């Protein structure tokens, strides 16, 4: 039987690797739970949300100077203030939909079959967007038009369906709205900060009574592992998509989703 420490490490790796790639971290965690017995009880389901903070802090660390410049500049620079407003505008749709329908979405759609179909459909869309001849007009994620931020935020709501991918939905939306591949990926990272911090705070509040000192130790392990893994993955990801696009990730989604459907059909 797998030890809790090893389980925490494996889930931390899955979270750190998949959170900022357009492949759906939630989908991969649900499939890991279904096929490998990772995270089957209440604590481990909350664990998957709690360790997202490690991945988020990796983004804060990687973009610390840029984010600090924007935060300080917002006091005197209209463009920096507009970017902060843009992130909040993009964040708002997820807050509204999450509060209204989050409980029902989890009850109805958090299912391995839904994950697999979402992975395949999302992979096909990502492949299509990567291959069509888009003409990027926006090359700086901190200078997108405000309406563009809003539509990216609306697209992010699709990621409440497990398997869709928060980063995938926001990257595709940004590219279709005129962003280049690198800036689309970067804004997806920036938008993840309030979105995932909000999810962390909400889930921690709900599960605080169930937490023991042992649980906190496991969360700390998963947190550190997801932080380190995300740091490595994000740096490599930006360089890769700038040169090669998203084809690799699109096919990964299709393959994982197809294998998952086969396994489910066979009763695995």
From Swiss-Prot:
It comes from the Bacteria. The chain crosses the membrane at residues 47-67, 83-103, 109-129, 144-164, 184-204, 218-238, 246-266. It is found in: Cell inner membrane. GO terms for molecular function: undecaprenyl-diphosphatase activity. Its EC number is 3.6.1.27. It catalyses: di-trans,octa-cis-undecaprenyl diphosphate + H2O = di-trans,octa-cis-undecaprenyl phosphate + phosphate + H(+). One of its GO terms (biological process) is peptidoglycan biosynthetic process. GO terms for cellular component: plasma membrane. It is a multi-pass membrane protein. InterPro entries: UppP. Bacitracin is thought to be involved in the inhibition of peptidoglycan synthesis by sequestering undecaprenyl diphosphate, thereby reducing the pool of lipid carrier available. Belongs to the UppP family. Catalyzes the dephosphorylation of undecaprenyl diphosphate (UPP). Confers resistance to bacitracin. This is Undecaprenyl-diphosphatase. It comes from Bradyrhizobium sp. (strain BTAi1 / ATCC BAA-1182).
């Amino acid at each position: 039987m797998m030890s809790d420490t090893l389980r925490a490490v494996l889930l931390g790796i899955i979270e750190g690797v998949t959170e900022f790639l357009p492949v759906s971290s939630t989908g991969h965690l649900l499939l890991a739970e279904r096929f490998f017995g990772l995270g089957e009880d209440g604590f481990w389901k909350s664990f998957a949300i709690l360790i997202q903070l490690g991945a988020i802090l990796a983004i804060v660390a990687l973009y610390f100077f840029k984010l600090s410049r924007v935060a300080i500049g917002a006091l005197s620079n209209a463009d920096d203030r507009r970017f902060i407003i843009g992130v909040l505008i993009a964040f708002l749709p997820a807050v509204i939909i999450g509060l209204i329908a989050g409980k029902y979405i989890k009850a109805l759609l958090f299912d391995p079959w839904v994950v697999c179909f979402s992975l395949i459909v999302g992979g096909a869309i990502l492949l299509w967007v990567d291959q069509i001849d888009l003409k990027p007009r926006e090359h700086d994620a901190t200078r997108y038009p405000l309406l563009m931020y809003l539509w990216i935020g609306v697209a992010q709501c699709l990621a409440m369906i497990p398997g869709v991918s928060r980063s995938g939905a926001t990257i595709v939306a940004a590219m279709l709205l005129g962003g280049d591949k690198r800036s689309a990926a970067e804004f997806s990272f920036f938008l993840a900060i309030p979105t995932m911090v909000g999810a962390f705070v909400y889930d921690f509040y709900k599960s605080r009574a169930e937490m023991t000192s042992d649980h906190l130790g496991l969360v700390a392990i998963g947190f550190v592992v997801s932080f380190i893994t995300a740091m490595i993955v994000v740096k490599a990801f930006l360089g890769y998509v700038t040169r090669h696009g998203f084809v690799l990730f699109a096919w990964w989604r299709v393959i994982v989703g197809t294998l998952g459907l086969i396994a489910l059909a066979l009763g695995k």
